[in-house]
Each structure stands twice: as structure tokens, then as C-alpha cells.
Amino acid sequence: MRKPIVVVGSINLDLVATADHVPLPGETITGRDFNTFNGGKGANQAVGVGRLGYPVSMVGKVGEDSFGAALKNGLRKAGVDVKAVQAVKGSSGVALINIGSDGQNNIVVVPGANGKMLPKDIARHAVLLRKAGMLLAQLEIPLITLETLGVFAHRHGIPLMLDPAPARELPAGLMQVITWITPNESETRILCGLDTQEPVTPATAARCADLLLARGPKNVLIKMGAQGVFLAAADGVRQMVPAFPVKAVDSTAAGDAFNAGFAVSLLSGKKPHEAAHYASAAAAISVTRKGAQPSMPSAREVAAFLKAQK
């Protein structure tokens, strides 16, 4: 029996405006379209895992508002176990997303109920968490709760994959209990102290991966958009895994699709570079579709995509 993936993280409603380009600071532009989608990095990754047919549970919170029930139901429909998703007083989390015609985006997240994920919630769901084959987490819930989760994972020998988004510095204690850390380019710049405009090349990624490994994580995956992914694994592997060339429509959930695909493939027995290849396919499919959770591919779609590349 496969041990489930358990995602501890955010559940949001995404409010998405599309325009010819992402507005610059102080700029007001006319948009072309507006949609709402279920989102939140935690929920996105849980849905990504569920769509790939792997057992997955979500630990998180929604508000007692008009969004909460719909957010929970969206998870359930994707095959996610939602017994550990709690409704609390106040608003659900929301994300305000602007998307340009090139697929690039900027995002403002208002935590809402996600801000009420507390350290005691880790203890409350300890039985579920102990059953996990891997724990997936992000930075859209309080940092102190993530530190508690990290200690729990380390104590029980459960691999912890951390997606360090939204970008910020991380405490040493948390870094030392991470099994996989998966920053994108902007997060890599912050974690490695690079200039905000410095391009993240394969050489830069290799240097940053070594810096991150020295701080405690056992493995590093640096997500570099169209360039691909730089992998620095505990088994000594250091390599670029190229991305698949596709026309991007919406890159909002590309990183979430990647993390979901990587976790599923790794727990299915693949080696890290093989799992990164599979995850890159999942991410490539996701950017060709609008919306966060709606963009997550099924296992059949990923298999067909990979077959078409041969």
C-alpha cells in the first residue's frame, strides 16, 4: 500500500485578471478578462497530486464564508482527502493575480484563514501526518507552524519538501530539517543573496545549490522556468533537467504542478533526475492552460505528453 502524500499549506480563491501585460508600479491598465479559480499553493499541489492518481490528504483551513465550502469541494473532486481541512471564522484566503499575454504574472496573497494555521494544528493532525510518505509545504501559512512541522517530520523520519514561496529568508532550524527545497529563480536570488536583477544561469544555480546544501537541506531543486531545473541531490547528482518548449498561457501554477509531479514520481520509485523529468512534463502541460487547479494534468495526460516527445 502506498503511503499518502500529505500537504500542509494554503487554500485560496484566486481572483485572476488578464491583460496585454502585467502592470508596472503605479500603472493602471485595462484588462481583457477576469475569472475566479480555486487556488493556494498548498491546495494546488494537493490537487496536482490527486490528478496524478496518487493518494493525498490536505491539512489546511478555509473561512466560514461563501468561498470556503467551494474551496473544500474543489479539493474533494480532485481526489484529495479533506478530513483535515477545517472551516474557521473569518474570510478564506485570496490571491489577486495579474497575468500578461506572455503568461507572466504577479500575485498578492491575503492569507485569511491560512493565517490561522497554528503549531497546535500539527499536533492535532499528528496521526495523519505520521502516515505520510512525504510532506509538502509552502510559505503561505505562518512560519512558526512550518518550523513545528519541520521538527515533526525530522523526528518521525518523514521526507519534507518545502516550496519557499512567497520568497523570504528562512530560519536555520527549518533549513536543517528540509529534505527537498524547491525555489524558483526569484526565491533563489533571495535565499542566496543575489541581486534582484541577476539572471539565474545554470552556473549560478549550481553555485546557489551548494550554498543552500551547506545550510542544511539534503537536496535542492532550482526551478528556472523555460531553462529547466537544476538538480543537486544527496546522491551526488548535479545536473540541469531541461524544460519542454511550450507556448505559455498562464504560468501561475507551474511550480505547483512541478512539485506535485516530482513528489509523485519520486515516491513511485523513480530516481531524482527521472522524477524531475516527469515533473517538468506536468509543469509544461500546466502552463498551456488557464487557472491554477484547472491547469493540473492527469497521469494519462503526462504519459501522453512524454510519449509525444520521443
What are these regions (language model features)?
Residues 134-207, 227-229:
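Conserved beta-alpha-beta core of the PfkB/ribokinase-like small-molecule kinase fold
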Residues 1-61, 66-70, 77, 247-249:
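Glycine-rich phosphate/adenosyl-contacting loop at the front of the ribokinase-like
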Residues 79, 115-120, 160-167:
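Short gly/ser/thr-rich secondary-structure transition/capping motifs
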Residues 87, 97-134, 139:
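Conserved phosphate-binding/catalytic loop of the ribokinase/pfkB sugar-kinase fold
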